[in-house]
Amino acid sequence: MALLIITALVFSSLWSSVSPDAQGDALFALRSSLRASPEQLSDWNQNQVDPCTWSQVICDDKKHVTSVTLSYMNFSSGTLSSGIGILTTLKTLTLKGNGIMGGIPESIGNLSSLTSLDLEDNHLTDRIPSTLGNLKNLQFLTLSRNNLNGSIPDSLTGLSKLINILLDSNNLSGEIPQSLFKIPKYNFTANNLSCGGTFPQPCVTESSPSGDSSSRKTGIIAGVVSGIAVILLGFFFFFFCKDKHKGYKRDVFVDVAGEVDRRIAFGQLRRFAWRELQLATDEFSEKNVLGQGGFGKVYKGLLSDGTKVAVKRLTDFERPGGDEAFQREVEMISVAVHRNLLRLIGFCTTQTERLLVYPFMQNLSVAYCLREIKPGDPVLDWFRRKQIALGAARGLEYLHEHCNPKIIHRDVKAANVLLDEDFEAVVGDFGLAKLVDVRRTNVTTQVRGTMGHIAPECISTGKSSEKTDVFGYGIMLLELVTGQRAIDFSRLEEEDDVLLLDHVKKLEREKRLEDIVDKKLDEDYIKEEVEMMIQVALLCTQAAPEERPAMSEVVRMLEGEGLAERWEEWQNLEVTRQEEFQRLQRRFDWGEDSINNQDAIELSGGR
């Protein structure tokens, strides 16, 4: 009997969650069905058991896949794999803008944890599967701009948590279930649909943001009795319903003749009210300031539901295109989803303000943990510093090589690498340069960044590229090793090297490793690993941008692949440079001596 109970428990645990193998197989099947090229999703390896390290994939702490975001990847007219139904822990599935053909598989109804489904801007055909009605946790459903046909399934009326349904620009026909008009945000335009009910009518501007079906029916009945009564009752119900729903305005899309509504859907991005963030931050009190950078101040906030957030109040935000341009760029940032990137959860815009809302990071930033911890707090140990270096590198690699268009950070430093409750590195402040650079081209001509972290070419030309991020990352590695600031004038008391980079280079040449490493580590580190991190940092901070490695190569070197060869090349080049510098120095000294020895009359020339 005991054996039977144990067996039952084992089987129940197996069925309660999906194994990493099965998750990986399902995702790889999706990659194949989408017809991804060898260059696309190249790290989705069928032989790799754990898909949680794959790009565009996010997992929870139990290694369950919770998010897959593949937006505008330009796949080659693939289809949706029915095997995706295995991913029962999936909460977010975004596949918009990929030219996907065929129908939506029935198995998608097995994704019982799904809260957001975005298949916008593809070539999907056939009917909307009725199995979508099984997704009881679904809040956001976006199927806009496809070729879907047939009627809207009645099963969607059972989705009680749905707050956003966008079905516009398809070939749908028939009646729209009346209960869907109670959803806060909907768009059924550019279809062959009618509003349904006892009195069919097209979905036009008569659809009211604040009325309901019963009030409309009452108005019609009253109209039979008397035309005057219709007007009176109409006014009565209008003001009654307006007052009743004053606290919650529904966002409704309707057809307007000769005009297209340009408002943008943001999936899970939340649009906050200014007053809500003002209250959350205690009127943007200085005591709640977490930090200040080139893009504005960051405030700690507490929402009314108890959620802790970080609110970034942008400066210099005005740019051509106004609110819509800002929103489009905010959406671009929100699409960059990776475990080592700070997730944007919402935004706020007013005539004079632009604010971004992020989750609050429990352990603040790398800079804080290195230099600002309180007495008695644990020191950031060497193992965590290694993990932070690798995590930040992976986040930047994703921005440079997996985002379309790619995102250049422009201010990589220890203060912009945040740490969650598990001390996992989360790169913040990415994508903000485009939001705040006033009337600039795609190549930023205004120097953005922090002294000591800015690459030489950025100072001389004002232009940024992926390689300026690599330089900033290299300086951050030196901060992790030394615990020191990138620029520190107190060093002038003992030496001429104000910049951390020059200071470390000098000590490295003199083989004084013990003087480089952070004294707080108390010699509790592995010497070879410290040397490796310093080598990667110096390769990243070479003066010529073309000689710096790409972030993908940095990741490989930190994982122990290819560093020895690259370091040997750098050392040989450095020897040549030193010899050339000494030769020029001797020539300069000789010339200076010659001038000093000349007669003053010769120097002044003829009179």
Curated annotation (Swiss-Prot):
**Where the protein is mainly located, per its record?**
membrane
Q: Where does ATP bind?
A: L290, G291, Q292, G293, G294, F295, G296, K297, V298, K312
What does the record give as the reaction this protein catalyses?
A: L-seryl-[protein] + ATP = O-phospho-L-seryl-[protein] + ADP + H(+); L-threonyl-[protein] + ATP = O-phospho-L-threonyl-[protein] + ADP + H(+)
Q: Mention any one GO cellular component term assigned to this protein in its UniProt record.
A: plasma membrane
Is this entry keyworded Signal?
A: yes
Top-level class of the enzyme under EC nomenclature: transferase
| Swiss-Prot/TrEMBL keywords | ATP-binding, Cell membrane, Glycoprotein, Kinase, Leucine-rich repeat, Membrane, Nucleotide-binding, Phosphoprotein, Receptor, Repeat, Serine/threonine-protein kinase, Signal, Transferase, Transmembrane, Transmembrane helix
E.C. number, please?
2.7.11.1
Q: Which regions of this chain are Cytoplasmic-facing, per the record's topological domains?
A: 241-607
Q: Where is the Protein kinase domain?
A: 284-568
Residues in the active site? D411
| UniProt source species | Arabidopsis thaliana (Mouse-ear cress)
Q: Which residues cross the membrane?
A: 220-240
Q: Which top-level group of life is the source organism from? A: Eukaryota
Q: Which residues carry this modification: Phosphoserine?
A: S365, S460, S465
Question: What family, per the record?
Answer: Belongs to the protein kinase superfamily. Ser/Thr protein kinase family.
Topology relative to the membrane: Single-pass type I membrane protein
Which named protein is this? Answer: Probable LRR receptor-like serine/threonine-protein kinase At5g65240
GO MF: ATP binding; protein serine kinase activity; protein serine/threonine kinase activity
- Residue ranges of LRR repeats: 87-111, 112-135, 137-159, 160-183
Answer whether the UniProt record assigns the keyword Methyltransferase to this protein: no
Which residues constitute the signal peptide according to the record?
A: 1-24
> Which cellular compartments is it found in?
Cell membrane
User: Glycosylation annotated at which residues?
Assistant: N74, N110, N149, N171, N187, N192
